[in-house]
Amino acid sequence: MKLFNKEEASFETLLKRLLVVCESHSRYHGSSLDPMVKVGHEMRKISGYLRCILRKHAANHDGMSLTQSIVNSYKSLFKDAQILDLYHNLLFGCMHLLLDANMSYFRMDSQKLFAVLLFKVYYKLRDIFYVTNEVRLGSLISAFVYKFKSCYDFISCNSLKYGSVRDVISGEVSLINLPPIDSNKVINRAYYRLDVKKLAINNKLVEILELDNGEIAIFEVLSEKMPYTLQTIDNLFQSLALGNHDLMNVGRSLLFRPFRSGDLDLIRLDDSGAKLKVPINNSIVLRLTCKDPIQWQEYWKHVIRKLFDSTATKEYKRSGSKISQQVYVRSNKPDYTSPKRNDDMPISSVKISDTIHNGRTLHRSIPLPGSLSSLIETSNEYPDEESLSIMSERATVSEDSDLDTSLKDIESLSCEKLIELDKSIQVPLSPKYMDTPTLKNIRTASQTFSLESVSPELIESVASEIDDSESIISEDGKDKRDKDLFDPDIDFYKPTLYRRKSSSLLSIFSKNKKNLTIDIPKNHSRSLFSLPGNQQSVTPISASPHDDNVDETYVSFPLSINTSGGAVYFENNSVKVSLWNGKSWVPLSKDMLCLSLILSGDNETLLIIYKDFEREKCKLVVKLEPTWKYNRSTAQDVQLRIPSSDFKASVFGTLHDLTLSIRCAQAAKLVNVLQYQLQSSQTSSLSPSTTTGTLSTVSSSSCFSRNVTRSSTENSELANMKDSSEYISSSLLLSSVKVRQHVKTKADVWKPSRVGYTDIFSQEYKGIVVAIKFVICSDAEGTLYPREYNSRLHDIKRLGRTGLSFTDKKEAYLLEFKNQDVVDHVHKLILPFNTSWQSS
């Protein structure tokens, strides 16, 4: 018992010393931009953890019996999950302050006491684990060791400093200022030992970084230690616990200006390093010794020789000039067309096409830059003599050949002519054996490719090769290449209801939107729904070659559906729709179809697929129900699983549930509209009269449209006006809007009271909106106990950037919304009612 009391007293003293250090740094106040304010905030949290830990230790000590052993006492203490969480927050919170990449305050030598106390606590916990073998405590210690090692190595390898850069090339060895090196340009790095007697550098650990432009940069390792492993990280912990805070001076410091080719002269290469000198000042000699001999022999030795060996550079230039002379002789011959040179073109300047083609994709060929003979280039892998002989042979072929090798003539050649052309061209540098061309291997490439110009034989042969459901790329010369069809990074879209100029939705059936095209990119369109049987879903209509069997029948829009007084949620005039028949995707039409999501006069959300927005040319009319399943299978494909009972009209039988694939450029927008409509129809418990014409449900993760004006609000029928009513009726304006409610104290100070969601209703009397009702469900109380507040229109005012104040029964309240866009939208909904009420 005495031994436990002694150990526990020592541990509590250690924790109290750490608490004093944390509390001394928790008093920082000032601007939020001051990094020390963030330190003070973190230190206040760590101080709270330490106080809770001390209380836990004191309670465990008071509850011990006189006969209880040290092992059992610590086991009973660390069986509590709460104290393990407290120690987790303590260790990781201190580690984040110690290894913050943006602030090196606690890595300064003056603040080493913080690190010393932290690792003494760590070693105390490790000793307790060795005694008790508590599994969760061991997991906490292992997680801390792994995380600290990872963060330490990361900040050490990626913190590059440029305060002591010397220009040894100029011979003055003066300090210079250089722009930082982009870490993305580093292609390789290795550790060396550097010796420069002139600069008093002896056996210094450095790291050499190879850049993508061929330069090398020599950085000093400030900690003078190689990266730690899980086996050697304990050496770092012991050193920090003993106060060796120099190891926290992490990072890399650039010693010299990056060296380019020819900046240094190579004196000697050996099995482990190199000796280099500065051409201007021969007294500056750099001795580099690689820490990894294998890496030196396999890679770095060749890099150093290529950069600084002057003899190798001269031989390379001499061989290049010899080849250029031969090319000059050949280019002076009559009727010789010089090929377009791109030898000096950097790799980064070549523009890569956004569409990646492979051998199994049918696409439009890129026009060749020159004649066929000019496309054969000399390989650098062959000696100079063989390269020159090959070039002379090709020049002879270019002069003696009777065949015109232009691309347009090749397209019109027969099989025999192509074979003759192939035999006349000698290509000894081919990397592999090429089969003799046959009819089935011939592919023609026209300048304006289209699916209609491809022969049926070619389609049949290519279709057998396309087994990965890739779509045929349809390209139009009038299309703009610099504009994407869709935004792949879109997070959400909230549909904004709008009314057309006509008071009825009948106008959407009389639009003429022909001659519209859409590019259909390559996609793997696979159905993710549970389909009967083991059939594998293949590509949708965009890749199906069976367009000849498409049924071009239509049905009329049902007369029983009232389309007057509704709203349009979504509309697109260029969609491709396919139907899954259990084995493959069957297109609904050869042409592009139109898709509309509307709200009918009977408060039903309808999905309509038709041609040219004509009422008599409908493919299907379906009512949206919560039982639908939807999925965005690819970037431009949306798949729907529709029950048979929801069809109002269709061109096919509706005895079974159907799966549709809809391809359009606005797939992300369509998915978000469907998600909102299906969720709102599932969760809505209000009567149809109170939900007709309401705006979109706004969750805590969404925002409002920025383009809502007063006129658009008035035209969207947000409230269901009842001119003949003799009682007060409520119409839902918005639902599930995230808010924080404040109440006003006696000192006229707003005090937060609860956080939750609010539904906003308009209160109407004889068709005139006289008040606004807020129904708030807090997160703590749940939806079973909502609180209702009624406020007159003139008592609702904007307050601050995100606030809206109102008065209910002579008590003032404040609703704080998520951002300014939300409160602007809410205020614009209420503003027209307030204006009309004042005018009346």
UniProtKB/Swiss-Prot annotation:
Top-level taxon of origin: Eukaryota
Family, per entry: Belongs to the UPF0508 family.
Identification of the protein by name: UPF0508 protein SCY_2952
The species this protein was found in? Saccharomyces cerevisiae (strain YJM789) (Baker's yeast)
Q: What is the lineage of its organism?
A: Eukaryota, Fungi, Dikarya, Ascomycota, Saccharomycotina
